[in-house]
């Protein structure tokens, strides 16, 4: 009951694929009978079934993988001393199957198409588990990678730091501070030296004694270079820095033209998901050219509320500056900008802000 099955005996015939074209995957999604419900991956993408053309292939069936275009395992949250259930399957009876943990064989069997293991994870850090199947001289593998955490270091916040990005003298280091009470582990992932968007032991944040704050000092930064990063909370939740002054948006940055914002840092596609924060030591300072500005009397204000994107087609500050004389001729002596900090989506009046300090 409540289980449905559909069999495709020959994908090439079923989908009318020409003989010279290689079939790599079948894209699928499921809908309820009335079409109201949809089952897909957590990122909303269709699910993909790999099509194996070789005589032998293998993959992990436990732990479960999300069938994204490049399959990713369901979140694995393990600590030193935990066990992990592993099951590898093959599409044919293999002459030999093996399971490796960090390069060491932990299970081995002949003439099987299923192999299981339940190793104890004894060392912290990145773990690599490989399933291997061999038949008539051909060997195929599947690889599973995840992070095993040790107990976080408990240490008070360094003197003088506050929530967010704290730039230190010398322009080669920062202290990141995140308020995340009740969490078990927080790590920093990004394009910092040695990180490459993978959870690493030396990027696990310290926890304050009151369990409210997490902090990490990152050194070896190049002055003036932009670095992108996220916080990885409990090994599953990726969040940007709430106090960041600049972010990368995977869904909307592509619509920003070079004339509006030249040289925008590329989003790390394929390495992470969600909004990404930016930090930059020794960032160029803004040079104020008007130092004697006097505000109009607040009792005599004539305010024009302006949405930058709608007011001028170029939706940039330079064009607005060239248009100020028009507003002055109308008698306007003050402009109230509609929210121009980061907000959800790319076309909005800005009343659904996402990052209050990122213009």
Regions inferred by a protein language model and the residue ranges of each:
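Exposed beta-strand face motif in extracellular beta-rich ectodomains
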Residues: 22-28, 125-129, 225-227
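Short, compositionally biased P/S/T/A/G/V-rich stretches that sit at domain boundaries
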Residues: 52-79
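Aromatic-rich carbohydrate-binding modules that target alpha-glucans
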Residues: 1-20, 33-43, 170, 175-226, ...
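Aromatic- and acidic-residue-enriched carbohydrate-binding clefts of CAZyme catalytic domains
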Residues: 302, 343-359
């Amino acid at each position: 009951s409540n289980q449905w099955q559909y069999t495709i005996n020959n994908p090439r015939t079923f989908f009318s694929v020409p003989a010279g074209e290689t079939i790599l995957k079948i894209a699928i999604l499921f809908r309820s009978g009335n079409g109201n419900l949809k089952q897909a991956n957590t990122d909303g993408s269709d699910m993909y079934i790999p099509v194996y053309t070789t005589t032998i292939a293998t993959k992990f069936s436990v732990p479960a993988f999300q069938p994204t275009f490049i399959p990713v395992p369901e979140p694995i949250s393990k600590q030193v001393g935990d066990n992990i259930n592993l099951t590898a399957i093959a599409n044919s009876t293999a002459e030999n199957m093996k399971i490796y943990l960090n390069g060491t064989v932990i299970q081995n069997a002949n003439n099987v198409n299923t192999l299981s293991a339940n190793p104890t994870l004894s060392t912290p850090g990145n773990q690599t588990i490989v399933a291997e199947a061999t038949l008539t001289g051909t060997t195929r593998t599947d690889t599973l990678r995840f992070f095993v955490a040790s107990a976080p270091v408990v240490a008070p916040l360094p003197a003088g730091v506050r929530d967010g990005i704290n730039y230190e003298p010398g322009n080669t280091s920062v202290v990141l501070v995140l308020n995340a009470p009740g969490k078990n582990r927080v790590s920093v992932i990004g394009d910092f030296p040695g990180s490459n968007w993978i959870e690493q032991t030396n990027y696990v944040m310290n926890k304050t004694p009151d369990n409210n704050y997490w902090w990490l000092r990152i050194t070896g930064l190049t002055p003036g270079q932009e670095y992108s990063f996220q916080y990885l909370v409990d090994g599953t939740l990726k969040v940007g820095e709430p106090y960041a002054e600049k972010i990368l948006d995977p869904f909307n940055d592509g619509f920003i033209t070079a004339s509006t914002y030249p040289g925008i840092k590329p989003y790390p596609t394929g390495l992470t998901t969600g909004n990404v924060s930016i930090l930059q030591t020794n960032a160029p300072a803004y040079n104020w050219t008007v130092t004697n500005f006097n505000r109009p009397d607040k009792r005599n204000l004539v305010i024009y509320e302006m949405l930058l994107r709608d007011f001028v087609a170029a939706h940039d500050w330079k064009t607005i500056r060239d248009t100020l004389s028009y507003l002055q001729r109308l008698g306007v002596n003050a402009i109230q900008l509609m929210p121009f900090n980061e907000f959800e989506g790319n076309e909005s009046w800005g009343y659904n802000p996402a990052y209050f300090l990122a213009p």
